[in-house]
Design a protein with these regions (language model features):
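Hydrophobic/small residue at the entry helix of a nucleotide-binding pocket
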Residues: 43
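NAD(P)H-binding glycine-rich loop region in Rossmannoid oxidoreductase-like domains
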Residues: 46, 50-61, 77, 94-133
Length: 338
């Protein structure tokens, strides 16, 4: 299955910059120790793979998901083999005392990449998960940055989101607050960030849900009025790597808009996905109809779909990567704006 074809593209976004800076990136990776926080999530795994395949001096990965961490190790061993450097994984929370002990005993690290986040707009619908979102997206970032600074890290990278530009929901606002705190901390610690679009088929995403629905022979449901930019998992790792290794202090990287990157609706992706799998989408009038006719339609190589107008409170009508009052550098890279 071609992710690029499903999201309506035929070219990868960052190839030219990755190739142009390949030697510099590889040399920095080979002589450095890395800590990746949230490394077993979708973006975290992509970043870990980009670092691992360039044979770092040391690569330590932290994530609270023990199962995802096990799969990450299996994936790396199956695709990249074994590097010559020190590779370790730790199933711990970056906000815990165990993490502080890890930093004290396993550090120092030249580069700290923090990919941990609560990223779903729906997570702000109750006060308890919202409190957790603020803890993860703001306070844990500050804590881990100060620990990195204390041990003399060369760079602290943190992933942000396009929703931090003129935020309209608490998820985006929490990331914007994070950016503001990091700018303050940049007085004593070099930092860089990246804002980018939806990562196609990332854990918990609607596209990841398509995989789940397909494997369980269940109907597809998707909004037909929400248009989004999508990057592949590999592209998410490449953008983070470019920012973390080549970004100057306080830089925020984002994908340049071009003919390669364009908006596409979730319903369009659902149609492309099903046709890629050999099924013709059959649009139903309701979710009930889609559920009731699932077995009948699937047997005829048709897949029941229900497309609707979005009802998720706080969803942004459009996506943007920067605001009018931010200084832009569109010349330094071919495919990335800063």
């Amino acid at each position: 299955m071609s992710i690029l074809e499903i999201i309506g593209r035929d070219q990868e976004l960052f190839t030219s910059d990755i190739e142009f800076f390949s030697k510099e990136i590889s040399e920095r990776v080979k002589r450095s120790k890395f800590l990746v926080i949230g490394g077993a999530g979708s973006i975290g795994q992509a970043v870990t793979k980009e670092i691992f395949k360039r044979d770092p001096q040391a690569l330590h990965v932290v994530d609270i998901s023990e199962n995802n961490m096990v799969e990450l190790v299996r994936d790396l061993r199956s695709t990249e083999g074994y590097g010559s450097g020190d590779f370790k994984t730790f199933a711990i929370d970056c906000g815990s005392v165990e993490f502080e002990a890890l930093m004290a005993s396993e550090g120092p690290y030249e580069y700290v990449f923090n990919l941990s986040a609560l990223k779903h707009v729906r997570s702000e619908s109750d006060p308890y998960t919202l409190m957790r979102m603020i803890m993860v997206n703001v306070f844990n970032i500050i804590k881990t940055l100060r620990l990195a600074n204390k041990m003399g890290a060369k760079k602290y990278f943190c992933v942000s989101t396009d929703k931090a530009a003129n935020p309209v929901n608490m998820m985006g606002a929490s990331k914007r607050i994070m950016e503001m705190f990091l700018m303050r901390e940049s007085m004593t610690q070099d930092i860089s960030m990246a804002r980018f679009a939806n990562v196609a088929f990332s854990d918990g995403s609607l596209l990841h849900g398509f995989n789940q629905r397909f494997s369980k022979r269940q109907p597809f449901a998707a909004p037909n009025d929400v248009r989004r930019y999508f990057v592949t998992p590999q592209e998410s790792g490449e953008l983070c790597l470019l920012s973390g290794l080549l970004g100057n202090n306080r830089d925020i990287f984002f994908p340049k808009l071009s003919e390669k990157l364009h908006l596409i609706t979730f319903s369009e992706i659902a149609v492309r996905y099903l046709r890629e799998r050999g099924y013709e989408p059959y649009e139903c009038e309701s979710e009930d109809e889609a559920r009731d006719r699932a077995e009948e339609l699937i047997a005829k190589k048709q897949w029941p779909c229900y497309f609707f107008k979005s009802d998720t409170t706080g969803e942004k009508d459009f996506e943007e990567f920067f605001t009018d009052n931010e200084d832009l550098d569109m010349e330094r890279f071919e495919t990335v704006g800063v």
